[in-house]
Amino acid sequence: CPLRSCHLPFTLFIRTFATAMTIHKDCIKTILWIWIIAGGLIYLLLRFVPWSFVSYPLSAIFVFIMGFSVFFFRVPDRKVVKGDNVVTSVADGEIVVIEKVFEPEHLGKECIQVSVYMDFFNVHVNFWPITGECTYYKYHPGKYLLAFLPKASELNEHTSIGIRNEYGEILFKQLAGTFARRIVCYAEPGKAAVKGNQCGIIKFGSRIDMYLPLDADIKVKLGDCVKACET
């Protein structure tokens, strides 16, 4: 079978469902288009290209893309850290910024900025970091610079979301990047935010900036790999 060597995508597909993962609802259409296009190309390769040393490897690549697309837009089952005064990471990724900054847009005061960079292989779904009330939401059009650059926080397309509970208020931003040009956000001022529930997704990676009170006890350091809901 020409596709026998391409068992990895199907393994990823099976693992996605076997480990209580689901597919993000806003990505189903994207996955379907990937499968339609890749499936069509595989058919054309196997039907009309007579050289197996060309058609088989290329078909294998497209099968891998089909399988990986399902794994790529997965929604993992996470054990949420409890405590209304405990802020968890909005996204999976690497800590790239921990510094004191002035947040002028909504909080209007000095905060601790903690930024999480999501690469191509991280889970792309975002989760509410605390339970409380959504107090602020704004979409900012912008550029698509590399997300790990410091100036990307202000210049790139992003959304800003504020949440408040009895312990205080925080703000976080979903930043688009060079490849991640599709931000989905479910925030709506006045609505409840529940820690661990989905608050959106940034397709194809990018970055999250979180703005925390100066007296927050930061439990991570630069270079740490974090998981949404659990870190």
Show where each model-derived region lies.
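Short hydrophobic targeting helices and cationic amphipathic motifs
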Residues: 7-8
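A domain-level signal for the mature, folded cores of soluble proteins
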Residues: 11-12
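Contiguous, well-folded functional domains in the mature portion of proteins
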Residues: 16-231
